[in-house]
Amino acid sequence: MPRILIADDEESMRVLVARAIALDGHEIVTAEDGAEALEILTDQDGAFDLLLTDIKMPIMDGIALALAAARDFPDVTILLMTGFADQRERASGLNAIVHDVVTKPFSVADIRTAVADALASKARE
């Protein structure tokens, strides 16, 4: 069963995404911001198949989290989420480390498909 770490400062979004992804039988761990997510990744020695993170968050944003995760845990696939066009542009330079950027708002089906695609690409590596 794939392990997925979700980082989003909006509780309602964390809950929605966690519930949607759990429908596919994944083990879910959540974090309120990038710093907490990085702490979880470090404490668990990167034992996740996928990091699904919002870009715009306080303390440590998703871009900084993605850079740290890719550096320290290169086997973890990274999927970003954002509702802001300027944040999506910031992420465009991270193609080497980020699987994709999912644009908010999205449907439950959209996020499940994005996660399935990211996990499938990891399996092909």
Please tell me what each predicted stretch does.
Residues V15-L23:
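Charged docking surfaces used in two-component/phosphorelay signaling
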Residues T30-L50:
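Acidic, metal-coordinating helix/loop segments flanking the phosphotransfer/catalytic sites
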Residues D33-E36, D61-L65:
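Acidic catalytic/metal-coordinating carboxylates
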Residues T53-D54:
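Active-site T/S-Asp motif of two-component receiver
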Residues M57:
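Receiver (REC) domain active-site loop signature in two-component systems and cognate sites
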Residues A64, F84-V102, A109, T113:
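Alpha4 helix (beta4-alpha4-beta5 surface) of REC/receiver domains from two-component response regulators
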Residues F106-L119, A123:
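C-terminal output helix
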